[in-house]
């Protein structure tokens, strides 16, 4: 189905150009991930390869942290800045609430504020990460560790993060898919060969002859679990709850009944990306507050290789699932639009009652989505910790979630482009 859809899409010039543009932008990003920051001893990173903090950073940076490249920060600062801006819109900061009522003008102001916050976060986190890695590695990461070197590295990494964010925006505006998701998606795809190579070495090369049977069993279980994750993720991400809609007789040309589709997991994979980004923050700012004891405890609390870290990661995913569900679907606006269009939900009064009904339904759907996302993300981490498996397995669930969700959204976008083209062609024939 996918290949047929892709074949049909490539026949359409506009869609083909979008796909080729996206591939070009991703190529530019991937090239940048191999350009190491000047003044860095990249060999020292090999000692840190098993750190949960580094693995999580690699995930949200699109696998750019392995070489401590100019794009090492990836879209992580932008994701964090987006969370901050969206939270401030919720009756927390009056000016942001006011902007939310200004339509396109307000949206441009939000985008500008997000960019400024991204700039500050990227610079602070860049220096923090460099200092953290330099401290943790026995081989000095920074060849000449002084203030001017740290400022230079921070500036380069900040510029890299801004460029990656801009590349993501170009994909969203002119290309195919969501830019942030596509950047992370490309990094996960690029890391797959290394992951399989690591699994092969850990289970079949660096083992004693008597442990081969155990290795075969574990690998077989991993394949089964991986296929199960693919199946259930695909099912949940495509599942819809259909709310019946009826129209008043006063609406000319409207059908007598229809339905309003809501995804069973309305927030998609964004809560996982948000949670992953948030867990990296304490480690990036810890060098600035090394004497603050509670911050060290917070770093341990957010490290997913500890029981408390796994619980915290799950809680963050659940909280962001509820938060982003109501960002995606606004019950008040939905009720208002239904009333304006002369439509209503059977047995539910238009207006305030419809808003309450939508809020209640969204909470139930968000609960299903949150539990699903948390389970898929946490299961491989728990398995890796309690069965002492290779660290490359830990974020396998999170990676699969992002891969499958981004792939499904991409297919739907392709279908939308093709349907729109067929509709426009039909209308032209009618004329």
Where are the language model's segments positioned?
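N-terminal cationic and glycine-rich segments that engage phosphates or anionic surfaces
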Residues: 1-431
């Amino acid at each position: 189905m996918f290949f047929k859809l892709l074949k049909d899409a490539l026949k359409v010039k506009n869609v083909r150009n979008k796909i080729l543009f996206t591939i070009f932008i991703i190529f530019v990003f991937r090239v940048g991930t191999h350009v190491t920051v000047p003044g860095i001893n990249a060999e020292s990173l090999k000692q840190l390869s098993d750190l949960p903090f580094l693995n999580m950073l690699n995930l949200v940076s699109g696998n750019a942290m392995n070489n401590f490249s100019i794009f090492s920060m990836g879209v992580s600062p932008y994701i964090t800045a987006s969370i901050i801006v969206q939270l401030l819109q919720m009756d927390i900061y009056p000016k942001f609430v006011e902007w939310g009522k200004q339509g396109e003008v307000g949206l441009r102001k939000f985008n500008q504020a997000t960019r400024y916050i991204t700039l500050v976060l990227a610079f602070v986190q860049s220096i923090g990460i460099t200092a953290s890695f330099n401290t943790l590695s026995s081989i000095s990461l920074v060849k000449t560790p002084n203030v001017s070197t740290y400022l230079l590295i921070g500036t380069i990494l900040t510029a890299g993060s801004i460029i990656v964010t801009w590349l993501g925006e170009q994909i969203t505006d002119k290309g195919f898919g969501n830019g942030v998701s596509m950047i992370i998606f490309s990094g996960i795809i690029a890391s797959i060969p290394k992951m399989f190579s690591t699994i092969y070495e850990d289970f079949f090369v660096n083992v004693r002859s008597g442990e081969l049977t155990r290795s075969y069993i574990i690998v077989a279980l991993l394949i089964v679990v991986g296929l199960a994750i693919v199946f259930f993720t695909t099912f949940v991400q495509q599942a819809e709850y259909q709310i019946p809609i009826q129209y008043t007789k006063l609406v000319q040309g409207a059908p007598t009944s229809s339905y309003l589709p809501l995804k069973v997991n309305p927030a998609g994979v964004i809560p996982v990306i948000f949670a992953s980004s948030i867990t990296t923050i304490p480690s990036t700012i810890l060098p600035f507050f090394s004497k603050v004891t509670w911050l060290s405890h917070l770093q341990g609390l957010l490290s997913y290789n500890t029981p408390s870290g796994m619980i915290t990661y799950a809680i963050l995913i659940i909280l962001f699932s509820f938060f982003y569900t109501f960002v995606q679907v606004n019950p008040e606006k939905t009720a208002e639009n239904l009333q304006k269009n002369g439509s209503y939900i059977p047995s539910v009064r238009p207006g305030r009652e419809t808003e309450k009904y939508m809020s209640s339904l969204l909470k139930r759907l968000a609960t299903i989505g949150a539990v699903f996302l948390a389970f898929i993300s946490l299961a491989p981490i728990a398995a890796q910790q309690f069965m002492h498996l290779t660290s490359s397995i830990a974020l396998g669930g999170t990676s699969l979630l992002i891969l499958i969700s981004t792939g499904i959204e991409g297919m739907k976008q392709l279908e939308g482009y093709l349907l729109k083209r067929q509709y426009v062609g039909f209308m032209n024939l009618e004329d």
